[in-house]
């Protein structure tokens, strides 16, 4: 599928965010009917979502997403996030620019893993400006990794296993070879920020009538499904769509079943954007 979208146009821009330079990628849509704002996960960057972005752009979405501070081509010490509220504020800056370029179009947030945490908090702060929220393997609810790592005097260097991402070996190989991906240990300020952000989302209330699509693999060992369910059920309001793929691992947008995942997502976009 990736080859079919290999030449999709991409644009870039930068702005000064709350804590430094933020790099943003854009994929213009074909006669855009909606705006999709991608929110990437820990240690990675939006460049890993080119296939997803191209599929969505071909389906009529104007797609864009920032590299969070400390990630990818944005500034800051690598993988250091002092406060996730700042990342949410930066994301809102990107959303405002997208709305200005596409006035009147519905805006949908798609957050993966740590990006799901950021997207959830965004929906709590700025949900009135959203048409829908999509969460893929979201770090919300009962996620024990930060507390476990913080219990050590020195944070252990336990790299993410590429095999935990997808059953497609090419995905793991590309991840391991990507110079913009962080392959070192998690950092204490970021882990502490995770703890605060998880609590903020937990205490921030539900999103009311905002449509929510939750996507998860039942063999996700990085962000186990049961813990996420706690957070999703607390966050979602009256309109939750849940889709779980048997045997799938953490990165559904890079999984062997990604064509099914893309189809589920585009159907949801059609519904929430009134197409």
What are these regions (language model features)?
Residues 224-233:
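Short alpha-helix in the alpha/beta-hydrolase fold that links the catalytic acid
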Residues 1-28:
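N-terminal cap/lid segment of alpha/beta-hydrolase-fold proteins
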Residues 208, 214-216, 220:
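Short beta-strand/loop motif that positions the catalytic acidic residue
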Residues 239-275:
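Catalytic active-site module of serine/aspartate enzymes centered on a nucleophile-bearing elbow/loop
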Residues 43-45, 72-102:
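Catalytic nucleophile-loop/oxyanion-hole region of alpha/beta-hydrolase
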Residues 33, 41-44, 218:
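Active-site glycine-rich loops that stabilize anionic/oxyanionic intermediates
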Residues 134-143:
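Active-site nucleophile loop of the alpha/beta-hydrolase fold
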Residues 53-76:
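Conserved alpha/beta-hydrolase
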């Amino acid at each position: 599928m990736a080859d079919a979208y290999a030449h999709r146009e991409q644009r870039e821009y930068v702005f000064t965010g709350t804590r430094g330079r933020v790099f943003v990628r854009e994929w213009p849509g074909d006669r855009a009917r909606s705006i999709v704002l991608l929110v990437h996960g820990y240690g990675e960057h939006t460049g890993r979502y080119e296939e997803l972005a191209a599929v969505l752009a071909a389906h009529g979405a104007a797609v864009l997403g920032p590299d969070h501070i400390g990630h990818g081509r944005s500034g800051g010490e690598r993988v250091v996030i002092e406060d996730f509220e700042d990342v949410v504020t930066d994301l809102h800056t990107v959303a405002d620019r997208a709305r200005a370029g596409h006035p009147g179009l519905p805006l949908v947030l798609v957050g993966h893993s740590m990006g799901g945490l950021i997207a959830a908090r965004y929906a709590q702060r700025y949900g009135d400006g959203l048409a829908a929220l999509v969460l893929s393997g979201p770090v919300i609810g009962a996620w024990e990794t930060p507390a476990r790592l913080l219990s050590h005097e020195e944070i252990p260097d336990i790299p993410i296993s590429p095999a935990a991402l997808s059953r497609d070996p090419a995905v793991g190989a590309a991840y391991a070879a990507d110079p913009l991906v962080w392959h070192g240990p998690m950092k204490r300020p970021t882990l502490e920020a995770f703890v605060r952000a998880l609590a903020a989302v937990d205490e921030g209330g539900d999103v009311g009538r905002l449509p929510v699509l939750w996507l998860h693999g039942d063999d996700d060992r990085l962000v186990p499904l049961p813990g996420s369910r706690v957070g999703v059920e607390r966050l979602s309001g009256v309109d939750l769509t849940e889709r779980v793929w048997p045997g799938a691992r953490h990165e559904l947008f890079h999984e062997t079943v990604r064509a099914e995942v893309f189809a589920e997502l585009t159907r949801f976009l059609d519904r929430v954007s009134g197409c």
